[in-house]
């Protein structure tokens, strides 16, 4: 499987300590199977930090890794209540709902796979957190949204399966 990582610089070696907090699936290294999504992230990162040039680093991941029983893998096939709670909990770095306190703050998962949150979805999540819309309303909004996908790596045990293939600049 080919995965892409968009940044404001080429990634020579994955260093999880350089990851930023408050991400969808917790502190980790994020990739996507979509080159266009990675390029958009690279361009956004350059604008945000006002430094570097858009770079998409290409990685190879053996498909069998996602079935490796020694890895703790969490997969969300679509946005649902579990996914919303998981993303909200990770973005706030504390469980928000005592009935569903699941998150990946402690890197209990080596790899997490699921829909990516964009700026429109962030707005909807904020409305939900403020109590202005309900989970069913949030899910209804997401139903008509074209979602992208991400695969995040949260531990050295997971990162070691990624092999750098190339870098493109855009």
Language-model segments: residues:
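A short linear-motif detector with a strong N-terminal bias
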Residues: 8-11, 35-40, 130-132
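Short, conserved beta-strand segments within well-ordered enzyme catalytic domains
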Residues: 3-5, 30-31, 58-60
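Short, flexible loop/turn elements at secondary-structure junctions
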Residues: 8, 31, 35, 63-65
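Short aromatic-glycine-(Arg/Gly/Cys) micro-motifs in beta-strand/loop hairpins
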Residues: 1-23
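Extended catalytic/binding region for NAD+/ADP-ribose chemistry, centered on the ART fold
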Residues: 20-44
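Conserved NAD+-utilizing ADP-ribose enzyme module
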Residues: 23-24, 44-49, 53-170
């Amino acid at each position: 499987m080919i995965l892409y990582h968009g940044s404001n610089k080429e990634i020579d070696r994955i260093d999880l300590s350089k990851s930023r907090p408050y991400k969808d699936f917790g502190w980790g290294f994020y990739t996507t199977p979509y080159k266009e999504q990675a390029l958009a992230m690279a361009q956004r990162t350059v604008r945000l930090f006002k430094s570097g040039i858009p770079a998409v680093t290409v990685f190879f991941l053996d498909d069998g890794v996602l079935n490796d029983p020694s890895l703790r893998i969490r997969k969300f096939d679509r946005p649902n209540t579990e996914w919303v709670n998981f993303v909200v909990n990770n973005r706030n770095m504390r469980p928000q709902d005592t009935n569903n306190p699941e998150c990946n703050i402690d890197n209990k998962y080596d790899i997490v796979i699921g829909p990516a949150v964009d700026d429109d979805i962030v707005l909807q999540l904020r409305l939900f957190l403020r109590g202005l819309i309900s989970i069913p309303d949030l899910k209804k909004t997401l139903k008509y949204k074209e979602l992208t996908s991400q695969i995040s790596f949260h531990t050295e045990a997971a990162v070691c399966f990624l092999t750098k293939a190339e870098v493109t600049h855009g």
